[in-house]
Amino acid sequence: MLLIKNGRVVDPKSGLDTQADVLVDGKKVVKIAENIDAGDAQVIDATGLVVAPGLVDIHVHFREPGQTHKEDIHTGALAAAAGGFTTVVMMANTNPTISDKETLKEVLTSAAKENIHIKSVATITKNFDGENITDFKGLLEAGAVGFSDDGIPLTNAGIVKKAMELAKENNTFISLHEEDPDLNGVLGFNENIAKKEFHICGATGVAEYSMIARDVMVAYDTQAHVHIQHLSKAESVKVVEFAQKLGAQVTAEVAPQHFSKTEDLLLSKGANAKMNPPLRLESDRQAVIEGLKSGVISVIATDHAPHHADEKNVADVTKAPSGMTGLETSLSLGLTYLVEAGHLSLTELLKLMTSNPSDLYGFDAGYLAENGPADLVIFADKEKRQVTADFKSKAANSPFVGEELTGSVKYTICDGEIVYQV
């Protein structure tokens, strides 16, 4: 047994926010109360710390199979635990892509060896070809939790419609990366800074919000659920809000980098601040924060995208791959740029990182209650820390290295076992 003493116990799902002890027995939380006496249980003193549900990230890239020089499922799991995450959903843009039952089973077999809960989507189209839809029914039966061609937008609207209809038939949903290549220039650079500082045509706002507009209206027509991944533009928030008010079943996520920073970070951090979609303008940053506050955006997801240092450190920054490692800074970015900045309460932040993403997929996760799963994070919500490149991830491609952030994970507990502690 494990007894967590004297913490601030916060459960966004029930609204619980109180000083209490938490008793864990096996894989379950068995009691939440004051002054629990559990005899010979292992004790964690959580005085001055927050005790919350283990975090849930529905958008990570663990690069296995085929790109394990960047990350693998084991190091990805270590990074997740260090960031306070007990449940993650891997994307399918591996090599080969997770487009068939055999590859999916291989990935899930590897994932099952780890000490956190690792799920996976499968691709919408075979090998990301954008034309031939995968076997949704068979892949779901084999363990896929959903479908996404994340990394590559689906340009064929007819395929999007068919995929939505198929997803609806199978009681699931598709998640979409929205950047129309026909309207975009060089990816990873917002159009403003691309023109001004790099003298290139960059990633445009219209490439994002026009594609979102198309897909949310297809969702409205099909009455299927569509999830919009890592939106970054003010107009995108408005389009999603419009569709939701119209009655379309549309959900959306934002990555921490997009509510924390703007395009200027490219000038100081170079390729480590290059990502798809790119960091945008301050007006966009404020708009996605407003979207989180209003509920239009219901999920914070990292888009954890590790790359090898040699790939990022190329002479021509436009040739560097896009993406940043994100699992180990996500909670701190939320605490720093949303809670400390006065935009959200701690409970509101945690809801976006626990129960909301979990409920999207119907996981038994993201809540802290008696008889519930013993998946917890214990953290100091006001402690300052300097981000270093000493990550559990294989990669250190974070533009936040060197920055002082608020919040520090002290323990992560999954299935009743301590999987990370400082």
From Swiss-Prot:
Residue sites binding substrate per the record: H61, F62, R63, N93, N276, H307
Gene Ontology terms describing biological process: 'de novo' UMP biosynthetic process; purine nucleobase catabolic process
EC primary class: hydrolase
CDD domains: DHOase_IIa
UniProt record similarity statement: Belongs to the metallo-dependent hydrolases superfamily. DHOase family. Class I DHOase subfamily.
Top-level taxon of origin: Bacteria
Active site as annotated: D303
Enzyme Commission code: 3.5.2.3
GO molecular function, one term: dihydroorotase activity
Keyword S-adenosyl-L-methionine: no
Residues binding Zn(2+) 1: H59, H61, D150, D303
Function: Catalyzes the reversible cyclization of carbamoyl aspartate to dihydroorotate.
PANTHER family assigned to the protein according to its UniProt record, in alphabetical order: ALLANTOINASE
Keywords, comma-separated and alphabetical: Hydrolase, Metal-binding, Pyrimidine biosynthesis, Zinc
Cofactor: Zn(2+)
Catalytically driven reaction(s): (S)-dihydroorotate + H2O = N-carbamoyl-L-aspartate + H(+)
Cofactor binding note of this UniProt entry: Binds 2 Zn(2+) ions per subunit.
This protein's GO CC annotations: cytoplasm
Record pathway: Pyrimidine metabolism; UMP biosynthesis via de novo pathway; (S)-dihydroorotate from bicarbonate: step 3/3
Protein name from the UniProt record: Dihydroorotase
